């Protein structure tokens, strides 16, 4: 009879087709600011901008929603980028001196980015050095000449010319240093070489003229038409940057000593010895180099000179600055990260006599800042995307789906009132190229990020562009050193140079205890809970007007006067007392301080009951914020949990203590191994396990592979950490009466279920009566394998998760089935289990042990709608493991549906930061400043759908592009993988930078729909299983 236990069911074609309509894996878009940017380019005709990174990624941005992403085949730093104006083509230079041509290609009405041709220098071993000049070893600068030719300046001083269409060298047009030296006086040569080519600049009116700057300081105007030198300027300072004047009658050069010089080009053929103007803006003391300089003319005659660097070396050599000089006005823009590059948005039409710059865009290492140059004061222009998510380090995140329009409008209004500027920019976002073809999102989604500085930021996550909406700061409630730091900063700004702080990236936190650990938002009442590192739990409410009021404070002792424990960690944050001013937005109403002040590890809010639950490494508490009184405090510490009392900053175990504990474990395991006598049930389990091994041959692959889960010791460190909290209206006392309950899961596999007595609200009233809430311990479940409990959810009689507070009462969701039997889904790090209620007897389980060492990290219930029918959807359990795999299971049957590889298992921070949404999407950090967005749903996908009006004929390169393999997008974006069965027998898709291919499915996939009669829940199978739960019933 045992052979039938392992018989594999045949695949049901109907179910497989349905799964393909429900599930599909997509990495769709990367939100945030590119990590480690290294190059910048702007196309003034198409109004698009490109950013290159050290990892070889290329990202092109236009209007909000217009994004293109690519990744070089060779992981090298992008050092320079140049658009071919109006053509949708981009030429990139990498640090290995290779050139790559990117093209925006339209397919089926939508545009995407493709890497076309590439050019590699002869130093690469795969090329024949004899066919290339020996001096073409390292390319230092690139200039596009007349749109179809590229000039390559090299380290040897030679300049080569390349045909852009084929990326082939043009024979007979190389400009060697010897040719240039013939036009230089003998006394200037002094037997020295000109040095590397430092800068190449094209003449706007006459493209055949090229301004060449050599590192030693020599400037030359070369005529490509006559193949001769028109002008020579004998500079003596080491050159850094060059720029033409608008009319070509003058040029400006910047140098390594912090000076810049203006040269006149109307002097004729004799070499020019002296510039017309030489100045050191921040002299006379030694200054750092001016790395880049721009000269922009205006009709008013007051021209702009914009440059980076040049600061006094001794006093401000560590500042990251861009200076803007116009007439007598000088502003030193002071940034908190290194300046990569900058450009101006100005008129480039040949018939215009002046540049008339509109905006200045500065790319920094950690953010992008755009300034309005037409408005007095040059204010910053709010960015609709590329906002630095990591302006302060992200510590937690959460997603809120289907945000009501009223709440959305109130949050947007609060954000608009938040930072009014005295000189508000009248300029709209200047990078407006392309058209967004995506439909307007049917529902609004909020992404909440908690940060190290005590702020919570609200982001519009409804579409491709992640737009900042509002910032909540909790630091104002507590006594910190913020005020002192602000006064010091103000004192510095009054000195010379005239510094002006620009940008929002601030990597420093005034107090690490302000860090946000957990957030929860009720979208129907606009109430919010924010919990921090020092045990602070804030209850906030959204207000549309500024207010001044005091914040109530309550302490909750989670240790309950337990003896033998002494907190050795950080102190609590001291709140301000009395009336405090609060701006429009979320304003704190209640501060709950956990004692000891350990970091909050779990929090949940039930606005309909006016209850908030919170947990730390010491226990959990329940608080009634309507009556401002605690309801419950439970200590979960094990007697050996001494590590929980040390705090995050003092967890350094001594060598003596470590050795002592190790020997104790060894001794305990030996003693327990000798003295333990196996019980009858364990003998039966061992016999069943041996019989199972004998029944199936070893070479036959058993699927699913489920290893034996070993029970953990009860004295494991930090076993009392509360991992999850959950409110539910369900059956806990008996099968006929349901009521409010609260559930808590810990690191040691314990689950506590409390029956709550919450006074019912009057008919038509929103708030409940002012009566005390009571909590009675109803059940206590101990998972015998003692794996940490990751999530808890109650399922109604139809096997669906219970609606959120107010959803059912306001007819915003289908009312739960309170007639049939409820069940509770408990997800631990090693297995999922469904228990019937109220008896808490095991009903269904799945041990996620397909790989040794696999642990559950994130779990969420999500609704997957069919791509073929709007009326059909299934609720499933989405799970992310420590191996970076995403699994989807049916609910409540826990049958595996699909399995994808999503995140590299080495990316620990990415796995820890993952957040699932209610509709089958997810976010995770691929860098400190970027979220990768992915979708598990075949229907609900958020990806760039855009087009670009380009003048270059694309059809000529289509055959060549189809012959070369398509390159994956950066970090694996926009790759589509369907359900496992649909991929069998088909060519494998391109591998991306982060693995996004799907592993083979498990053999025991459910062959039928979970709604059909044949898909009844599998009975609990304890073959070879040691995970028999111990349940205490305190209400029986």
Curated annotation (Swiss-Prot):
Known role: Cortical cytoskeleton protein found in a complex involved in maintaining cell polarity and epithelial integrity. Involved in the regulation of mitotic spindle orientation, proliferation, differentiation and tissue organization of neuroepithelial cells. Involved in axonogenesis through RAB10 activation thereby regulating vesicular membrane trafficking toward the axonal plasma membrane.
GO cellular component terms attached to this protein's record: axon; basolateral plasma membrane; cytoplasm; cytoskeleton; early endosome membrane; Golgi cis cisterna; Golgi membrane; myelin sheath abaxonal region
Protein name: Lethal(2) giant larvae protein homolog 1
Chief site of localization: membrane
Disordered: annotated span: 667-688, 980-1002
Oligomeric form and interacting partners: Associated with nonmuscle myosin II heavy chain. Interacts with PRKCI/aPKC, PARD6B/Par-6 and PARD6A. Interacts with STX4A. Interacts with RAB10 (GDP-bound form); the interaction is direct and promotes RAB10 association with membranes and activation through competition with the Rab inhibitor GDI1. Interacts with DCAF1.
Disruption outcome: Mice exhibit disorganization and disruption of the apical junctional complex, resulting in hyper-proliferation of neuroblasts and brain dysplasia. Loss of Lgl1 in mice results in formation of neuroepithelial rosette-like structures, similar to the neuroblastic rosettes in human primitive neuroectodermal tumors. The newborn Lgl1(-/-) pups develop severe hydrocephalus and die neonatally.
Basic residues: bias regions: 667-677
Keyword annotations from UniProtKB, A to Z: Cell projection, Cytoplasm, Cytoskeleton, Endosome, Exocytosis, Golgi apparatus, Membrane, Phosphoprotein, Repeat, WD repeat
GO biological process: axonogenesis; brain development; exocytosis; Golgi to plasma membrane transport; maintenance of apical/basal cell polarity
Pfam families associated with the record: Lgl_C, LLGL
Subcellular compartments: Early endosome membrane; Golgi apparatus, trans-Golgi network membrane; Golgi apparatus membrane; Cell projection, Axon
Sequence ranges of Polar residues compositional bias: 679-688
Annotated family: Belongs to the WD repeat L(2)GL family.
Gene3D superfamilies named among the record's database cross-references: YVTN repeat-like/Quinoprotein amine dehydrogenase
Gene source species: Mus musculus
Positions where Phosphothreonine occurs in the chain: 957
SMART domains: WD40 (SM00320)
Maturation and modification: Phosphorylated by PRKCI on at least one of the following Ser residues: Ser 654, Ser-658, Ser-662, Ser-669 and Ser-672. Phosphorylation is important for appropriated cell polarization.
Keyword check for Transmembrane: no
């Amino acid at each position: 009879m045992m052979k039938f236990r392992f018989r594999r069911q045949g695949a049901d074609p109907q179910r497989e087709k349905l799964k393909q309509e429900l599930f599909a894996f997509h990495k769709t878009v990367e939100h945030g600011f590119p990590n480690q940017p290294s190059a910048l380019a702007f196309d003034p005709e198409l109004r698009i901008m490109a950013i290159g990174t050290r990892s070889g990624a290329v990202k092109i941005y236009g209007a909000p929603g217009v994004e293109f992403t690519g990744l070089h085949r060779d992981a090298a730093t992008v050092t320079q980028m140049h658009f071919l104006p109006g053509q949708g083509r981009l030429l990139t230079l990498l640090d290995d001196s290779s050139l790559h041509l990117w093209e925006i290609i339209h397919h089926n009405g939508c545009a995407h980015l493709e890497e076309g041709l590439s050019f590699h220098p002869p130093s690469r071993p795969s090329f024949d050095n004899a066919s290339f000049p020996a001096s073409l070893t390292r390319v230092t600068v690139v200039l596009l000449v007349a749109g179809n030719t590229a000039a390559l300046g090299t380290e040897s001083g030679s300049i080569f010319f390349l045909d852009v269409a084929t990326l082939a060298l043009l024979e007979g047009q190389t400009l060697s240093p010897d040719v240039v030296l013939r036009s230089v006086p003998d006394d200037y040569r002094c037997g020295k070489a000109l040095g590397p080519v430092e800068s190449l600049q094209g003449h706007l009116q006459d493209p055949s003229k090229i301004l060449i700057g050599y590192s030693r300081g020599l400037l030359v105007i070369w005529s490509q038409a006559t193949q001769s030198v028109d002008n020579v300027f004998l500079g003596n300072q080491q050159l850094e940057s060059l720029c033409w004047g608008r009319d070509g009658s003058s040029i400006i050069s910047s140098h390594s000593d912090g000076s810049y010089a203006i040269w006149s080009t109307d002097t004729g053929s004799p070499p020019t010895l002296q510039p017309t103007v030489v100045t050191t803006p921040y002299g006379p003391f030694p200054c750092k180099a001016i790395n880049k300089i721009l000269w922009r003319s205006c009709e008013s005659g007051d021209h702009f000179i914009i440059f980076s660097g040049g600061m006094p070396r001794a006093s401000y050599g560590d500042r990251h600055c861009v200076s803007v000089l116009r007439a007598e006005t000088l502003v030193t823009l002071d940034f908190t990260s290194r300046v990569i590059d900058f450009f101006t948005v100005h008129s480039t039409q040949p018939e215009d006599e002046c540049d008339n710059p509109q905006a200045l865009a500065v790319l920094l290492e950690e953010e992008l800042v755009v300034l309005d140059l037409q408005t007095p004061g040059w204010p910053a222009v709010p960015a609709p995307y590329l906002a630095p998510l990591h302006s302060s380090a992200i510590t937690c995140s959460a997603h809120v789906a289907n945000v009501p329009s009223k709440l959305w409008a109130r949050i947007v209004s609060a954000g608009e009132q938040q930072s009014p500027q005295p000189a508000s920019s009248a300029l709209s976002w200047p990078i407006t190229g392309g058209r967004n073809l995506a439909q307007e999102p049917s529902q609004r989604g909020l992404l909440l990020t908690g940060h190290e500085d005590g702020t919570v930021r609200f982001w519009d996550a409804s579409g491709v562009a992640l737009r900042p909406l509002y910032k909540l700061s909790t630091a104002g409630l507590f006594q910190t050193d913020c005020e002192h730091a602000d006064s010091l900063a103000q004192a510095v700004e009054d000195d010379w140079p005239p510094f002006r702080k620009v940008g929002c990236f601030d990597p420093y936190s005034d107090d690490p205890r302000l860090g946000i650990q957990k957030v929860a938002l009720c979208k129907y009442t606009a109430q919010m809970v924010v919990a921090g590192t020092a045990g602070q739990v804030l209850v906030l409410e959204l207000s549309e007007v500024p207010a001044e009021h005091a914040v109530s404070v309550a302490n909750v002792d989670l240790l309950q006067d337990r003896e033998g424990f002494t907190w050795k960690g950080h102190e609590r944050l001291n709140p301000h007392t009395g009336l405090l001013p609060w701006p429009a937005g979320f304003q704190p109403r209640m501060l709950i301080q956990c004692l000891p002040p350990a970091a909050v590890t779990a929090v949940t809010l039930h606005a309909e009951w006016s209850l908030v639950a919170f947990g730390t490494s010491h226990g959990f508490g329940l608080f009634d914020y309507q009556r401002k009184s605690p309801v419950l405090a439970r200590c979960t510490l094990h007697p050996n949990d001494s590590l929980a009392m040390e705090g995050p900053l003092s967890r350094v175990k001594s060598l003596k203590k470590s050795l002592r504990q190790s020997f104790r474990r060894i001794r305990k395991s030996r003693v327990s191994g000798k003295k333990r006598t196996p019980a009858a049930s364990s003998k039966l389990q061992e016999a069943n396990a041996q019989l199972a091994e004998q029944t199936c041959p070893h070479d036959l692959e058993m699927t699913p592979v489920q290893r034996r889960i070993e029970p953990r010791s009860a004295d494991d460190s930090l076993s009392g950490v509360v991992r999850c909290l959950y409110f539910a209206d369900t059956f806990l006392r008996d099968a006929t009466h349901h009521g409010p309950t609260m559930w808590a899961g810990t690191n040691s596999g314990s689950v506590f279920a409390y029956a709550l007595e919450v006074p019912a609200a009057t008919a038509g009233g929103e708030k409940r009566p002012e009566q005390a809430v009571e909590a009675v311990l109803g059940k206590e479940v101990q998972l015998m394998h003692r794996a940490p409990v990751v999530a808890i959810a109650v399922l109604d009689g139809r096997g669906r998760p219970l609606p959120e507070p107010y959803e059912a009462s306001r007819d915003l969701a289908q009312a739960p089935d309170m007639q049939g039997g409820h069940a509770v889904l408990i997800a631990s790090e090693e297995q999922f289990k469904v228990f019937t209620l109220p008896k808490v007897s095991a009903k269904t389980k799945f041990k996620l042990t397909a790989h040794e060492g696999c642990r559950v990290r994130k779990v969420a219930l999500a609704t997957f709608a069919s791509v073929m029918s709007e009326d059909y959807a299934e609720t499933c359990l989405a799970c992310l493991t420590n191996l970076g795999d995403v699994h989807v299971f049916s609910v409540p049957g826990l049958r595996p549906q699909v399995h994808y590889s999503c995140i590299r298992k080495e990316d620990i921070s990415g796995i820890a930061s993952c957040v699932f949404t209610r509709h089958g999407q997810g976010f995770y950090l691929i860098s400190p400043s970027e979220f990768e967005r992915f979708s598990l749903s075949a229907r609900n996908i958020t990806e760039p759908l855009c087009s670009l009006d380009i003048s270059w004929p694309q059809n000529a390169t289509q055959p060549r592009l189809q012959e070369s393999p398509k390159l994956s997008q950066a970090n694996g974006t926009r790759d589509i993988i369907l359900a496992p069965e649909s991929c069998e027998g088909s060519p494998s898709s391109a591998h991306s930078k982060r693995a996004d291919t799907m592993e083979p499915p498990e053999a025991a996939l459910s062959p039928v729909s979970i709604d059909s009669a044949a898909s009844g829940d599998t009975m609990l199978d304890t073959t070879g299983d040691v995970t028999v739960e111990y349940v205490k019933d305190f209400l029986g």
